[in-house]
């Protein structure tokens, strides 16, 4: 008996190699351009109520650069995600 090998290249597609994400280190990150510091906002500021959020928005608008926006009423539900 003899062996007979036949290759069906049309049926077997070569699997693409998974793309590796390029690692970024500190030397690849440049200084910010056109940066304007307007306010400090922490997670505790949002939990203190909507008056605080409104105050932060007013503070940021007073610094300038926010003239293109339109006012909008937004309702947010805060969810406590404490790890047990």
From Swiss-Prot:
A Pfam family matched in the record: PBD
Domain of life: Eukaryota
Residues with lipidation of kind S-palmitoyl cysteine: 10-11
Major localisation: cytoplasm
Membrane topology: Lipid-anchor
Keyword field: Cell membrane, Cell projection, Cell shape, Cytoplasm, Cytoskeleton, Lipoprotein, Membrane, Palmitate, Phagocytosis, Phosphoprotein
Subcellular locations according to the entry: Cytoplasm, Cytoskeleton; Cell membrane; Cell projection, Phagocytic cup
Residues modified as Phosphoserine: 43, 52
Gene3D superfamilies: CRIB domain (3.90.810.10)
GO cellular component: cell projection; cytoplasm; cytoskeleton; phagocytic cup; plasma membrane
Keyword Lipoprotein (UniProt): yes
Gene Ontology process terms (BP): phagocytosis; regulation of cell shape; regulation of Rho protein signal transduction; regulation of signal transduction
GO MF entries: small GTPase binding
Annotated CRIB domain residues: 29-42
Keyword Cell membrane: yes
Function: Probably involved in the organization of the actin cytoskeleton by acting downstream of CDC42, inducing actin filament assembly. Alters CDC42-induced cell shape changes. In activated T-cells, may play a role in CDC42-mediated F-actin accumulation at the immunological synapse. May play a role in early contractile events in phagocytosis in macrophages.
Subunit (UniProt): Interacts with CDC42 (in GTP-bound form). Interacts weakly with RAC1 and not at all with RHOA.
Domain remark text: The CRIB domain mediates interaction with CDC42.
Family: Belongs to the CDC42SE/SPEC family.
Protein name: CDC42 small effector protein 2
Species name: Pongo abelii
Encoding gene per record: CDC42SE2
């Amino acid at each position: 008996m003899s062996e007979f090998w036949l290759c069906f290249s049309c049926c077997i597609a070569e699997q693409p190699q998974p793309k590796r994400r390029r690692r970024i280190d500190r030397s690849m990150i440049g200084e910010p351009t056109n940066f304007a510091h307007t306010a400090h906002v922490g997670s505790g500021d949002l939990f203190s109520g909507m008056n605080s959020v409104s105050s932060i928005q007013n503070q940021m608008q007073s610094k300038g650069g926010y003239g293109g926006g339109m006012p909008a009423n937004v309702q947010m539900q805060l969810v406590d995600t404490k790890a047990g």
